Amino acid sequence: MTICANLWLITKRKIKLKQLLTLKINGETHEVWTSTHKTLLEVLREDLYLTGTKHGCELGECGACSVLIDGEPVLACLILPVEVQGQEIQTIEGLAKNGVPHPLQTAFAEQGASQCGYCSPAMLMTAKALLEINSNPDSNTIREALSGTLCRCTGYSK
């Protein structure tokens, strides 16, 4: 095979490894050309520059990458963006409205529930999902809901 033929095959493969996605994120529609192997987390952070969602373990163990898909917490490191086309994706960037922090953000800040802040976006998104289905959860329910997000500096104990 000639060098030109090899380059053509490589170029052809690269084209096939990209896809156009239409994603609804924080109430806005985004069209993005991205690699088919990228996770939702990678597309959010690398292609759309929504870096509030944190990159932790890539194994679904730490919970740092939690976002809401149609109101449900989902680990963005374990899902391909093609799987959530047509669904509403909410990241931490969409929690505040018109520059006004969401009441959960205010409560977290007032209670000192953040030290390094790495787990905070995931905890906030998970807490939001919990409060959508249970507006008055007891402390055990809150602990259980947040248990999927690990905090390395123990800010979760607050």
Positions of PLM-derived features:
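Signature of N-terminal electron-transfer/Fe-S-associated modules in redox systems
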Residues: R13-K158
